[in-house]
C-alpha cells in the first residue's frame, strides 16, 4: 500500500527498525499523521507502537479532522476514539510499547492490543464506521489508515502490516443459517460448528422483528450471501401473508387477489450486513422502476449472487405480472447495494408455460452454475437447471431431486467445509408441522437422503418449524462474535 502523506526528514527519522515521528497537536484533528489508503473492503492492519516521553500514539481509521476512529495511548491509558467523537479510556496494562490492530470487516471494526502478538485483548468490536464518509462530513476522501503522534516528543512505529482479510474456505469453521417463521414473519439466525446441529441465536427469538423493517409488517424468504468483497448481503420478501388477521391491513392482500394473485406485493428488501451485526437497509420498489412494471403481481424470494463477468452484485427473484405465471428474473445492483441499476430480465422460465418456476437458488460449482428451483408441474418439488453463465441459458432437467412425497419449496445448496460434499436443503411445507429436509451429493447425480431436521443426522437444539432457509460459512471468530453479541443482549 502507498502512503499518501510524505513526512519530511525534519519530522520523521528512521532509527534502525523504528520510524520515529515527531508529535504535534492535542487531538487527532491536529496531530501528526502518516496516512495510507486501504485497498480492500475487508482488511486487517497492525503496527507496533513505542510511545515516547510526553507523547500519545496509536493506530486510526481517519476520514477527516472531524471523522476518525481507532486506538491510541499515552502509556498509562488507552484512548478509544469512536464515531461522532465518543471516547473511552481503559487502562493500559501493556506499557509504552504495544501492538495495535484494526480489523475492518465491511465497515464493522474490531480494535485489539497485544504485548507479544500472540495474545490479543479486544477493546472494541462491531464498531460501525460506515457513516464516516462525504455525505456526513463533506470532502471526497477515503477512510484511510493512520499512524498518529500527538502531544510532545515523538513516537516510534515498526512492523507495520496490512493484509486482505476476506476469508477463504480453509479459514472457515462454522455455519450460519437464516430463516423465518410463519407465526412471527421475522428473521432468525442459527449457528452450527459442524454443519449438522444448529442452535438459534437470541434464545430462538427473532434477531430482527419483521414489523420493524417491512412495509407489510412482515418478512419471508430470507437469503444470505457472502460477496467477493467479504461483506454479507441479505435479501428478504417484504410480505405478511396473515396481515389482515393480525390487524396490519383491512384486506387479505395489498391489492385485489383475483386480479393480482396470492401474496401480491411489488416490493422486496435488500440489505447489506456490516459484520453480521450492523445493517444498511434498503426497500426496493420494483413497480417503480418503470411504467411497464406497475402491474407486477409479486416479487418473491430474492437472492443475491455476484456476476464475475459484469463485476456487479446480481439479485434474482420470482416475479409475475398480475395473476400470470411466475417466472425467474434478475437485475443488477450498484456496488453500494442500495440502488437497482437495470430492469428485470428473464433468468429462467418453465418450458411448459402453464406451469411455474419459483424460488431459484444459484451456486457456482466448478465452471458451471447450478440453479435449483421449485417446479409446480403437478405438485411442488425441486428441480435443477444448469448453465455456463450466471444470468441465463439454463438447461431444463425434468428430474425431481427432492425425496419428499409432500410439497416442498425454497431449495438452498451449501458445501460442507473442507469436504467434497454438497447439501441441498429445502422447506417441506406440505407437512404439519412443516420442516426442513436435506440431501447430500458429491457429483450432483447421486444424492443421499439425510432426512428432515430431528429425524436423522440433521438436528436443531432450540427451534422448530423453520421456513425458507439459507446457509453460509463463517470463520470460528465470526461465529464467536455473533454468539457473544446475542448472549450479551440478554
Protein language model regions, located:
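Structural motif
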Residues: 184-190, 243-249, 259-269, 324-331, ...
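Loop/turn-rich, solvent-exposed surfaces of beta-rich toroidal or solenoidal domains
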Residues: 377-384, 389-391, 401-437
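Active-site neighborhood of glycoside hydrolase catalytic domains
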Residues: 307, 333, 373, 377-379, ...
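Conserved Ser/Thr-centered positions that define the repeating blades of beta-propeller domains
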Residues: 111-114, 192, 270-276, 331-334, ...
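Entry beta-strands of beta-propeller and related beta-repeat scaffolds
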Residues: 171-176, 230-234, 310-315, 368-370, ...
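Extracellular glycan-recognition regions
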Residues: 1-171, 471, 487-489
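Residue-level signature of beta-propeller blades and closely related beta-rich strand-turn architectures
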Residues: 181, 238-240, 319-321, 375-377, ...
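Surface loop/turn signatures of beta-propeller and other carbohydrate-active proteins
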Residues: 87-93, 122-146, 166-173, 179-180, ...
Amino acid at each position: 500500500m502507498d502512503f499518501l502523506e510524505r513526512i519530511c526528514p525534519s519530522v520523521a527519522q528512521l532509527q534502525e527498525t523504528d520510524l520515529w515521528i515527531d508529535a504535534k497537536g492535542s487531538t487527532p484533528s491536529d496531530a501528526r499523521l502518516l496516512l495510507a489508503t486501504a485497498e480492500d473492503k475487508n482488511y486487517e492492519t497492525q503496527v507496533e507502537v513505542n510511545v515516547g516521553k510526553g507523547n500519545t500514539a496509536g493506530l486510526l481509521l481517519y476520514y477527516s479532522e472531524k471523522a476518525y476512529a481507532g486506538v491510541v495511548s499515552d502509556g498509562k491509558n488507552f484512548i478509544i476514539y469512536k464515531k461522532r467523537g465518543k471516547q473511552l479510556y481503559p487502562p493500559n496494562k501493556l506499557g509504552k510499547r504495544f501492538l495495535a490492530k484494526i480489523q475492518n470487516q465491511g465497515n464493522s471494526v474490531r480494535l485489539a492490543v497485544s504485548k507479544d502478538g500472540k495474545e490479543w485483548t479486544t477493546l472494541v468490536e462491531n464498531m460501525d464506521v460506515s457513516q464516516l464518509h462525504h455525505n456526513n462530513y463533506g470532502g471526497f476522501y477515503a477512510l484511510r489508515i493512520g499512524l498518529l503522534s500527538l502531544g510532545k516528543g515523538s513516537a516510534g512505529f515498526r512492523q507495520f502490516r496490512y493484509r486482505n482479510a476476506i476469508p477463504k474456505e480453509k479459514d472457515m469453521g462454522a455455519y450460519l443459517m437464516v430463516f423465518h417463521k410463519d407465526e412471527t414473519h421475522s428473521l432468525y439466525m442459527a449457528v452450527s460448528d459442524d454443519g449438522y446441529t444448529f442452535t438459534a441465536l437470541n434464545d430462538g427469538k427473532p434477531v430482527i422483528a419483521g414489523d420493524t423493517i417491512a412495509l407489510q409488517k412482515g418478512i419471508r424468504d430470507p437469503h444470505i450471501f457472502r460477496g467477493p468483497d467479504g461483506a454479507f448481503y441479505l435479501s428478504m420478501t417484504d410480505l405478511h401473508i396473515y396481515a389482515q388477521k393480525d390487524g396490519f391491513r383491512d384486506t387479505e392482500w395489498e391489492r385485489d387477489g383475483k386480479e393480482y394473485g396470492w401474496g401480491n406485493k411489488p416490493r422486496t428488501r435488500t440489505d447489506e450486513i456490516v459484520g453480521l451485526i450492523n445493517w444498511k437497509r434498503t426497500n426496493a420498489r420494483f413497480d417503480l422502476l418503470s411504467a411497464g412494471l406497475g402491474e407486477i403481481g409479486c416479487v418473491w424470494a430474492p437472492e443475491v449472487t455476484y456476476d464475475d463477468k459484469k463485476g456487479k452484485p446480481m439479485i434474482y427473484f420470482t416475479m409475475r405480472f398480475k395473476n400470470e405465471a411466475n417466472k425467474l428474473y434478475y437485475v443488477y445492483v450498484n456496488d453500494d447495494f442500495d440502488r437497482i441499476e437495470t430492469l428485470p430480465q428473464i433468468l429462467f422460465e418453465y418450458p411448459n408455460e402453464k406451469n411455474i418456476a419459483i424460488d431459484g437458488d444459484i451456486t457456482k460449482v466448478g465452471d458451471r452454475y447450478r440453479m435449483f428451483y421449485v417446479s409446480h408441474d403437478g405438485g411442488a418439488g425441486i428441480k435443477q437447471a444448469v448453465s455456463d453463465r450466471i444470468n441465463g441459458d439454463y438447461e431444463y432437467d425434468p428430474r425431481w431431486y427432492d425425496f419428499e412425497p409432500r410439497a416442498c419449496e425454497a431449495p438452498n445448496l451449501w458445501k460442507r467445509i473442507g469436504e467434497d460434499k454438497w447439501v441441498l436443503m429445502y422447506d417441506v411445507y406440505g407437512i404439519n408441522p412443516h420442516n426442513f429436509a436435506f440431501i447430500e451429493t458429491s457429483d450432483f447425480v447421486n444424492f443421499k437422503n439425510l432426512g428432515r431436521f430431528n429425524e436423522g443426522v440433521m438436528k436443531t437444539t432450540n427451534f422448530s418449524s423453520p421456513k425458507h432457509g439459507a446457509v453460509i460459512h463463517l470463520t470460528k471468530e465470526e461465529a464467536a462474535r455473533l454468539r457473544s453479541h446475542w448472549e450479551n443482549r440478554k
